[in-house]
Amino acid sequence: MAELKSSKLDAENARNEYNLFKSSLAQIGTIIVQNVIMLGFGMSLAIPTVVIGSLMSDDGVVDDGGDTMTLTETEASWYGSVLLVCHPTGGLLSGVLQEIVGRKWCMALVSLPQLVGWYVLWRAGNAFDLYVSCVALGLSMGLSEAPVLTYVGETVEPRLRGPLSSVSTFTIMLGSFVAYLMSTVMPWRTVAMINMAVPVVSFAAVVLLTPESPVWLLSRNRPAEAKKSLAYLRGCASTADVEDEFSELSIYAGFNKSVDLEQYVDCGIDQRRLSYVKYLQINTNDTTNAEIDILANQSQTGFLDTLKSFWTPELNRPFFFIMLFFFFWSFATFIPAKPYLIAVFSEIGLPCTAQWTLVYTSILTLVGTLLNVLTVAKLGKRPITLVSMALCAFSMLGIGIYMVSTTYFSFSSTWIPMILLNALFFFSGYGVFPIPWMLVSEIYPTKGRGIASGLTAALAFLMTFILTKSFLEMQEWFTLPGLFIVYGSITLIGTLYLYACMPETENKTLQDIEHFFIGDLDDYEDCNNLS
């Protein structure tokens, strides 16, 4: 499929009045601060693996530092998956909440259920308490994802959007690694107690150091505050310095009521809408309000209007694309096995203990995610995704074939599955786990972006919940080697799907990406020189 090409030069060429370095530093600093939230996300995602590994083994019970709690296989399957089924509820709630209270305060409110979840886990006395803690942690995970991704898409320049949108995935992996590492030297209750500090720090960081999204402020008819927020995000520049970018942002968001649209056609403005506006200006006596009526319409839409907009190509085409991506993502990352990784590693037969393999593979995932941050702007999302998906598929197929060979052909070499596992976790962190979340911040238009991103995150984790809850049953049906082969085969099919349907969005404006998904290829080729 032909790739997108940006319809304009880098944003800095049009805004040479203020310092580019300060602008970059302000955006990077803001995104790093808000991503303290995602550190708690990663710890929440990892804690079921730690607890299940401590409280359940093949004979049913493992004593963890004198802890008398136990988990049956059924309780473990529910505990490992209830986190993921509560995530969609939080995701749907965040889609509505961030439109009401704003991106900033939606991110700040994440800390409340997360703090409750860690406290309940610390004081847990039975399986029900574990479920309650996962409900709270799952809600906090769902509440955090959509506003963080939406905020990046609305505040970061195209030249930085790719690397900074992958920072959240890196922070998630960092949180998981820290949780795994702590679990090797202390009981899981102590891990939960220490983790209670994370939501407190993240709440303070977001409230004190993060400005509200300019796009959301525009949608609430607060242009003066929006301009100040944009100026802060561009290196504490003056509002006069960001006037040009503010006008472009206002037009794209559909809230500008005064500027001449024709000068922005080459920047990605829909030419059909421009023509209609000019038609109304010529054929009505009210030449000033015609533009206002058309462009201000988006800011007056309600919740039901936003839901109706899902029937439009601007929303439903990227929605169906990204949901299929997430379906294959669930298999390629091997995330349904995450709560049971200690048992999986033990069955494969590796040269080191399962607990330290967990730490080691989390380091590889973390390194892969960091490499993504450093290379995505140069290499692009599409080639990174295709190569990583293919290598994850071959790694899982290789592990499955190896395990079959040890059963039927008496062949064994523990370093072969170790190398394949290393490849699986490294490339899942490099080009599979972060990419769809990066796309969520880019592919949706302003109208409905908050709800669409929340719904996407919710359904993605609902799929993951179903696969996680059924993992042990599927393992009984297919055996673990067969399950690796099934996962690898589905990932290979997903690679072919993405090869056919995934556009390149790196260094492209949001207008360019929107044109791609509405299928306006004629205008697209004229504006972007598609090859």
Label every PLM stretch briefly.
Residues 2-225, 258-531:
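Transmembrane-helix signature of 12-pass secondary carriers
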Residues 234, 245-259:
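Extended, hydrophobic alpha-helical segments
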Residues 238-244:
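Boundary/linker segments of alpha-helical solenoid repeat arrays
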Residues 223, 231-238:
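TPR/TPR-like (Sel1-like) alpha-helical repeat modules
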